[in-house]
Amino acid sequence: YHKIMYESLLELDPVRINFNAAGMHTINIVLSFIMFGVALGIKPQQFTTMLKNPKSTLVGLFSQLVALPLITFILVVIFNDIITPTVAMGMILVAACPGGNISNFMSSLSKANIELSVGLTASTTLLAIITTPANFAIWGGLYVRYVNKHAADALQMLEIDKWQMFETVFILLGIPLVLGVIFARLLPKVTEKIKKPIQKLSIVFFLAMIVLAFSNNFDLFLRYIWFVFFIVLVHNGFALLTGYSVASFFKLKDADRRTLTIETGIQNSGLGLVLLFNPKIFPPDLHIGGMLFITAWWGIWHIISGLGISSYWSRKNVKES
């Protein structure tokens, strides 16, 4: 079975999603709009609350920026015989992305610590300017060098231009985030009116972005979705479990445990897709279809798994500890 899975996943690699300049701009605008929506929910006092309770914040950052990439690397090593190099690199890329924008909505649904959730999403997003290229380079480099000797051929020594990645992340995440915070500060009444609609629109735009990107390869998507589904199911399950386990290990209170579970399990895979679509970062002659499919399906699946966990927790009272 694992041979069938490996060979099937190999067939994804030649898939290349080419956008013209207008298409690329549209996708960049969508991601920037999503991040602007996240920023509208950020209030300066949330950061002071985080500073008063630094333990949960530091544990949350550790869970997302260190534990998740490490657990992902271990999974990639375990799955080495059944997943292709590009699928492995797709998993590593998703783990290197910051927290996803829908995690704040899910945290409020889960009766979790919403201030911690917003603070962590904002922090990991700003830190992503450094941590996304760094985590991808470190764990991806270890994988190519030590885990899968064929990976170097398959990926033609994926030499990522770290500065280009840094610049892209800064423009798409950093700038909209800062603009959103300034907008919310200057126009608080307008912000209250538009915040919820923008966050709902964000999810619709993100799903539309994935559907449009893969519409030409929909038959392939349907043919191999089960293999991709299984890998993302396991990876996302371990991401959620990592958040919960790390929070439990450090004896955080129940509301914070829920926040960390969601923050670690919900990743900004939209950023991953935008990086993959950028020809300056991933040259068009690279066969990285496996990375595209993993990152795209993660973007859909974490909404389903996140809502599942949130609806379960919404019925459970938070334990006071």
Could you describe each region identified by the protein language model?
Residues Y1-H2:
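Intrinsic-disorder-associated, low-complexity terminal segments enriched in Asp/Asn/His/Tyr and depleted
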Residues M5-S321:
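Alpha-helical transmembrane segments of multi-pass small-molecule/ion transporters
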